[in-house]
UniProtKB/Swiss-Prot annotation:
EC number(s) stated in the UniProt entry for this protein: 3.2.2.27
Molecular function per GO: uracil DNA N-glycosylase activity
Protein name: Uracil-DNA glycosylase
Family to which the UniProt record says this protein belongs: Belongs to the uracil-DNA glycosylase (UDG) superfamily. UNG family.
Enzyme class, spelled out: hydrolase
UniProt keyword Lipid biosynthesis present: no
Alphabetical keyword list: DNA damage, DNA repair, Host nucleus, Hydrolase
SUPFAM superfamilies: Uracil-DNA glycosylase-like
């Protein structure tokens, strides 16, 4: 039956036998005959040229589903990027070549477009790479992987899980502190959620997505920050040994797979209150220090000061 409600009739050219359905007024093909189809010619007609390719942004929000952009073709000035985003010069050797890659150019192009359109992006431009400013690649000792920045204004400042002083620690950070106090019961309880004291000791607090639209978690996953972060982690793994990786949740564990013969790789459920496994029992902070002690290296002071 067609969309008008009339019975669908098939000619004898396409069937050898017609049967009427018992339950509906529809003619059913009992022995359909296959039609011969003409193959479409391959390639473009002579003289036809296509415009330069554009890429559709499959954003999680419908607001950007119709937006397109063309990849940057001009050479990206790494010095300019380092200056604009306040990236520490200590990271130049590790990041400069990667920032010239076409995908990285696309990230910054789209980031600028969003800013110019009036979108409120967190954290501020100067804090997106704040994780580079507390220690250089050769000083990294512990790597903790997060997902994307807190989407609430005033919270995110470029360090995974950390919030600015004066901000009430979010639930995930409270669970991290609970595990910390379980491991070190004599430690002074944290009075704020700023983890800069960890970062200064070589704890890399790195989100896999470096920006977010205010109020919309996961909104900037499509930009491609994850690829840049994976390259950073890959180079750290290749150039260093003896690092401690704390991979909390499936997302972090899929982001990087360090060689356990060269590094200490610790896994646990995410500290989110929605996790089925309580984070309070996570002993990663103690295990990291035990690892450093065996190597004759100083421990990390996990106090939040």
């Amino acid at each position: 039956m067609d969309v008008s409600g009339e019975p669908t009739v098939c000619s004898n050219a396409y069937a050898n036998e017609m049967k009427l359905s018992d339950s509906k007024d529809i003619y059913v093909l009992a022995h359909p005959v296959t039609k011969k189809t003409r193959k479409r010619p391959r390639g473009l007609p002579l003289g036809v040229k296509l415009d330069p390719p554009t890429f559709k942004l499959n954003n999680m929000s419908h607001h950007y589903d119709t937006e397109t952009f063309t990849p940057v073709s001009s050479q990206l000035d790494s010095v300019e990027v380092f200056s604009k985003f306040n990236i520490s010069p200590e990271w130049y050797d590790l990041l400069s070549d990667e920032l010239k890659e076409p995908y990285a150019k696309g990230i910054f192009l789209e980031y600028n477009r969003l800013l110019n359109s009036g979108e409120e992006i967190l954290p501020s431009t100067g804090d997106i790479f704040a994780w580079t400013r507390f220690c250089g690649p050769q000083s990294i000792r512990v790597v903790i992987i997060g997902q994307d920045p807190y989407p609430t204004a005033g919270h995110a400042h470029g360090l995974a899980f950390s919030v600015k002083r004066g901000i009430t620690p979010p639930s995930s950070l409270k669970n991290i502190f609970a595990a910390l106090m379980e491991s070190y019961p004599n430690m002074t309880p944290p009075t704020h959620g700023c983890l800069e004291s960890w970062a200064r000791q070589g704890v890399l607090l790195l989100n896999t997505t470096l920006t977010v639209r205010r109020g919309t978690p996961g909104s900037h996953v499509y930009l491609g920050w994850g690829r840049l972060v994976q390259r950073v982690l890959q180079r750290l793994c290749e150039n260093r040994t003896g690092l401690v990786f704390m991979l909390w949740g499936a997302h972090a564990q899929k982001t990087t797979q360090p060689n356990s013969r060269c590094h200490l790789v610790l896994t646990h459920a995410h500290p989110s209150p929605l996790s089925r496994v309580p984070f309070r029992n996570c002993r990663h902070f103690v295990q990291a220090n035990e690892y450093f002690t065996r190597k004759g290296e100083p421990e990390i002071d996990w106090s939040v000061i």
